[in-house]
């Protein structure tokens, strides 16, 4: 159902005076350039996200249609005025479709460039994001597309949608008899279903059920390679991988099929180097090794027709274009070129036909299309005032700190900034210990902490970020002086990979980007867990432990956007503290500046989450009512409390403004 079929939001702030009046002075090109570099938007944004002249994040879901763009900050404010609750996912299905077109186009160019005669299919592994909006947006893109399943539930979803694609279905993962029968039923219905053998125990069941159903199975084999990528997901590939057959087992499978008279059923070769491959060299090495499997299987009389290179196509979460865990040092064209060339070269060298190439590029398709937007519910700033001099009879540690402070302001002093900082830290440490033993009063402790903050600020002003020797001190002080921002979201629900594997996601304010980022901040969620904090942020060409922030009003802080959360995060999110799924909307942007918004997920209520843990909301309401009736409160107040409790049960799990 469409919430707002045409919101009429302008596509470009510069073309509409109503938005121009929001800010008297448009952002200068110099400031724009600085902000783009600070947050690396030009690289991870991939032309989908940019900063407009108002200093707001703008979204262009299809870079081939640059006039179709929307001011995200203004969109969120408009939605809030219409009742939108935060946090919420803002999803852009047009980005999904553009990603699919872009990958298909890259492989088309590579095939034409190298004279490759085989076809290419992108098979979407729905485990990356199984939401209906994602699957159906990709299917309706008009592009060739296959679907991959890794479980019975996923296979049921894939088979139900298969009539819309009439393409390729790849079945991976552990399989029981029911899973295998479902896949064979799909084949018997006329779909091209590849059952990929991951364990030798599967083949006997496949042959048995194929005979029962009187269907010729279409099989694949997953080979376990010696080649392996690096990074956070490296264990999903290589010789120690959870899935796949070793070389000896591949030979055993071939002989089993030969003896059963089903060797012609083995048509697909599959391998997987790992997810989010950062280094193109690792990809090239793995494809060359797998190409040898293709050659050797043909020598054994196996007519492999499809070459499934699996996943691995990464995205640049950092925007550093590097080999780091959350970046990539290649683009779509280089990725496609390396795969097509390696397979084609092996075929030409051995006089073999060019197979159909399949990639399972789920992350690269989905990551960019979703932004989590939330509000800051509280800010704790390290505000400081320089205290007055201590009394003459004050303890020595206080006197020492004051002497250091005075020396910092004396002209011509030869002590280093680091030395000043170390002296003040040692004095403060002594005061904290003394406070615990009763030597110092609360007032004296507060005085020392205020003076230390003043010293940190003074040292920070004199440090040069371009001086490599100053960088460790700068990082230390930025952590010490950073604002604490309490954000209305659950890290465990909305960005579980940031908690579980320390993955980095681009995070930045949606507005105020027309100002120099002079402040630093750390982001904390609203769960009752110390792990509910983001530890790493983009900061130019590096990664920092604090987030650059433009100056802002702490009483009215900007909304924040958590970008590139479209892959895995919605599916992996957990229910810590019973925070549930957020609301989600699909946003469609058109060249005339109009915007269509559809509510795709209303988000979980408190009652929904309680039911997950077998706490029946009606029973809880009854128990609460019984308690209220036993109080000596007047009837009107009892009724008020009951109504508030019931409203809370069916309200949002996140914090809501009155």
UniProtKB/Swiss-Prot annotation:
UniProt enzyme class: lyase
Cysteine disulfide partners in this protein: none
Subcellular location: Periplasm
EC number: 4.1.1.19
GO cellular component term, pick one: periplasmic space
UniProt cross-references to NCBIfam families, sorted A to Z: PRK05354.1, speA
Name assigned to this protein: Biosynthetic arginine decarboxylase
Annotated source species: Escherichia coli O6:H1 (strain CFT073 / ATCC 700928 / UPEC)
């Amino acid at each position: 159902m469409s919430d707002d079929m045409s919101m009429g939001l302008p596509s470009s702030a510069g073309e509409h005076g109503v938005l121009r009046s929001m800010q008297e002075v448009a952002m200068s090109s110099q400031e724009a350039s600085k902000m783009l570099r600070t947050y690396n938007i030009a690289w991870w944004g991939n032309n989908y996200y940019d900063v407009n002249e108002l200093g707001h994040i703008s979204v262009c879901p299809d870079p081939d249609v640059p006039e179709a763009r929307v001011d995200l900050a203004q969109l969120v404010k408009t939605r809030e005025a219409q009742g939108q609750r935060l946090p919420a996912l803002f999803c852009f299905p047009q980005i999904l479709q553009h990603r699919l077109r872009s990958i298909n186009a890259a492989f088309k160019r590579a095939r034409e460039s190298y004279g490759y005669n085989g076809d290419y299919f992108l098979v979407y592994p729905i485990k990356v994001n199984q939401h209906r909006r994602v699957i159906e947006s990709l299917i309706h893109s008009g592009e060739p597309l296959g679907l991959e399943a890794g479980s019975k539930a996923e296979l049921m979803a894939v088979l139900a949608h298969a009539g819309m694609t009439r393409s390729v279905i790849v079945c991976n993962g552990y399989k029981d008899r029911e899973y295998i029968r479902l896949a064979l039923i799909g084949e018997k219905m006329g779909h091209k279903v590849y059952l990929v053998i991951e364990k030798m125990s599967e083949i006997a069941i496949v042959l048995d059920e194929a005979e029962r159903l009187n269907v010729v199975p279409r099989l694949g084999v997953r080979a376990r390679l010696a080649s392996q990528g690096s990074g956070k997901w490296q264990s999903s590939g290589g010789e120690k991988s959870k899935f796949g057959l070793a070389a000896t087992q591949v030979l055993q499978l071939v002989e089993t099929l030969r003896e059963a008279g089903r060797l012609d059923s083995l048509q697909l070769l599959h391998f997987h180097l790992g997810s989010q491959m950062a280094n193109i060299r690792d990809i090239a090495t793995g494809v060359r090794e797998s190409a040898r499997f293709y050659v050797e299987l043909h020598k054994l009389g196996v007519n492999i027709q499809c070459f499934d290179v699996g996943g691995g196509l990464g995205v640049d979460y950092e925007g550093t274009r590097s080999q780091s865990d959350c970046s990539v040092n290649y683009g779509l064209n280089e990725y496609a070129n390396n795969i097509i060339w390696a397979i084609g070269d092996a075929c030409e060298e051995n006089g073999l036909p060019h197979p159909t190439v399949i990639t399972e590029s789920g992350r690269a398709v989905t990551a960019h299309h979703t932004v989590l937007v939330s509000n800051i519910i509280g800010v704790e700033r390290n505000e400081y005032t320089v205290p007055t001099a201590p009394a003459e009879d004050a303890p020595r540690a206080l006197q020492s700190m004051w002497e250091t402070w005075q020396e910092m302001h004396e002209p011509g002093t030869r002590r280093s900034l680091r030395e000043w900082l170390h002296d003040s830290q040692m004095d403060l440490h002594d005061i904290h210990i003394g406070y615990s033993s009763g030597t110092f009063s609360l007032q004296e402790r507060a005085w020392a902490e205020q003076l230390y903050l003043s010293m940190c600020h003074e040292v920070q002003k004199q440090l040069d970020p371009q001086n490599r020797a100053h960088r460790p001190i700068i990082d230390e002080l930025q952590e010490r002086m950073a604002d604490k921002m309490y954000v209305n979201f659950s890290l465990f629900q909305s960005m579980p990979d940031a908690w579980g594997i320390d993955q980095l996601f681009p995070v930045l304010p949606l507005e105020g980007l027309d100002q120099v980022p002079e402040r630093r901040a750390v982001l904390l969620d609203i769960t009752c867990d110390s792990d509910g904090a983001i530890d790493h942020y983009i900061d130019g060409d590096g990664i920092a432990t604090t987030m650059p922030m433009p100056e802002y009003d702490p009483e009215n802080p900007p909304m924040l956007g958590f970008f590139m959360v479209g892959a895995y995060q919605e599916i992996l999110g957990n229910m810590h503290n019973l925070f549930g799924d957020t609301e989600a909307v699909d946003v469609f942007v058109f060249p005339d500046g109009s915007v269509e918004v559809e509510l795709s997920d209303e988000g979980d209520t408190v009652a929904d989450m309680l039911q997950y843990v077998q706490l029946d909301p009606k029973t809880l309401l009854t128990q609460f009512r019984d308690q209220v009736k036993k109080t000596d409160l007047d009837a009107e107040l009892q009724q008020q409390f009951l109504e508030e409790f019931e409203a809370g049960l069916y309200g949002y799990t996140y914090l809501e403004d009155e």
